[in-house]
Amino acid sequence: VEGLYISPEQAGAQNQKQIKAFDPAEYHAICEAAEGHLRRWSVAPELPGADEFARFARDNRITLSIAHSDADFDTVCRAFEIGYRHITHLYSGCSSVVRKNGFRIAGVVEAAYYLDDMDVEIIADGCHLPLSLLKLITKLKKPEHIALITDSIRPTGLDVRESFSGSSDDPIPIVVEDGVAKLLNRQAFAGSIATSDRLIRT
């Protein structure tokens, strides 16, 4: 599961209407409905209730992953200590260095490099991350802590230019061009259309 408990500031192509605060009754119900098949959950650890969620995930053998997060460096390091050991699609929907009142604040990306045992995913489709960042990631992270992912969505493998992301009940229109899926305003990617072999070739 990716969401529902993510940062609106790092939502990317996620449906803003489906972003929620941690709700124990809700995530207990989701886990129960999954009947033991829920193996990983990607959330933003800076949100209130993330610690309680971490305990719940551990009790239910669910791998915790950081995704669509605006957390600062210290928050990620603390999250790592309580069980958040994975980062979903590094650089995509992740905070990085920002300036606040003149001071630089490190984020998820910097913590990913600092924490040797933090696993990271990379969308190596040739679009989401330039070759320079792929080189940096593979130089600073050990191979056993890097996972290639497609992050592919609906139009993958189809000869279409227009499609949608999310539920058909509340679709987010997307356009396919330049080898990637984009939001209609072209200000952000909506997902990948890559297959696994493309990641290896990149």
Q: What are these model-derived regions, one by one?
A:
Residues 2-105, 157:
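Histidine/acidic-residue-rich, glycine-tolerant segments that coordinate divalent metal ions
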